[in-house]
């Protein structure tokens, strides 16, 4: 039960993180938001890593792997923050959910993993759901709608890149170095887009760091306390939170086609999770 609660709270925290980021995009570049988020979150990530894993969690055996992961993290976050400047929170969130489909496809095509025909059908169905949401060629189509899909692809690469990290490193080490490399790499570019931070916005930057770090920590703990097949599908509750937050703060109400496409994506993703679990067993 604790794992389920942690997963639900963690997902909700990340949705608040996204809502705060959307608010900040009204006055700041996505790159500056990302830099500030990682910079403020770094002390929290350090303390969490030390508390959960001790001194060994602070050391990396493959720093270049973390550098690559940090680059992917910056790219994914930048594209997503850019997308929510123009798209509704629920629409962008729904499209992000194709990440598990990308993971399955990449694993099969490039990593030699065995993927049965049922999972391939689920992947195809999920991408059909993307077409329903994006509606290319339609009057409502926006090119920026492809950014969350690109974000999902890069995020899939980020998840798969965890395999290149030394097996002796804990998830807390990964969290710490992801935050640290994200802050370091974005620091080189952020002067190009930097604007002075208004005093009234400081709490928003602190909030995005706190909720983002808390969300990642709680979700990590959830997978440690409960079977993945139980907690992983709860990630899709983000669509509910994104819809509520988008409606409350921006009066965003997704249309019927967006909900239909999102439902297809979610069902496909959950099916893949369940099939992968049964294959492992």
PLM regions and their residue ranges:
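Transmembrane alpha-helices of multi-pass small-molecule transport proteins
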Residues: 2, 28-75, 154-158, 177-192
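Loop-to-transmembrane-helix transition segments
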Residues: 2-10, 49, 55-79, 143-151, ...
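Hydrophobic/small/kink-forming positions within alpha-helical transmembrane segments
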Residues: 11-16, 46, 70-78, 100-105, ...
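Transmembrane alpha-helical segments that form core, pore/gating elements
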Residues: 22, 30, 137-197, 204, ...
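Structural signature of hydrophobic alpha-helical transmembrane segments
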Residues: 29-43, 82-99, 141-154, 198-212, ...
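Helix-helix packing/entry segments at the starts of transmembrane helices
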Residues: 36, 93-98, 165-180, 217-247
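C-terminal transmembrane-helix exit sites in multi-pass transporters
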Residues: 80, 99-121, 240-259
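Hydrophobic transmembrane alpha-helices of multi-pass small-molecule transport proteins
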Residues: 118-135, 151, 257-276
């Amino acid at each position: 039960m604790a794992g389920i609660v942690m997963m639900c709270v963690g997902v909700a925290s990340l949705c608040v993180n996204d809502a705060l980021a959307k608010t900040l995009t009204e006055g700041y570049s996505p790159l500056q938001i990302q830099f500030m988020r990682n910079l403020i979150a770094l002390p929290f990530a350090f303390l969490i890593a030390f508390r959960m894993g001790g001194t060994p969690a602070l050391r990396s055996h493959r720093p270049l792997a973390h550098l690559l992961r940090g680059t992917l993290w910056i790219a994914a976050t930048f594209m997503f923050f850019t997308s929510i400047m123009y798209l509704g929170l629920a629409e962008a969130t729904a499209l992000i959910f194709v990440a598990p489909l990308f993971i399955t496809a990449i694993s099969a095509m490039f990593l030699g993993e065995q993927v049965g025909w049922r999972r391939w059908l689920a992947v195809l169905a999920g991408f059909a759901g993307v077409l329903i949401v994006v509606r290319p060629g339609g009057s409502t189509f926006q090119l920026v709608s492809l950014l969350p899909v690109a974000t999902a692809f890069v995020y899939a690469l980020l998840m798969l890149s965890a395999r290149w990290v030394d097996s002796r490193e804990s998830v807390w080490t990964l969290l710490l170095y992801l935050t640290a490399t994200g802050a370091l790499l974005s620091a080189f570019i952020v002067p190009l887009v930097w604007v002075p931070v208004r005093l009234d916005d400081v709490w928003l930057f602190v909030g995005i760091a706190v909720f983002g770090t808390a969300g990642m920590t709680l979700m990590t703990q959830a997978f440690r306390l409960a079977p993945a097949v139980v907690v992983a599908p709860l990630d899709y509750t983000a669509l509910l939170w994104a819809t509520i937050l988008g409606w409350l703060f921006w009066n965003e109400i997704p249309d019927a086609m967006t909900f239909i496409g999102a439902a297809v994506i979610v069902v496909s993703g959950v099916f893949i999770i369940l099939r992968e679990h049964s294959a492992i067993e």
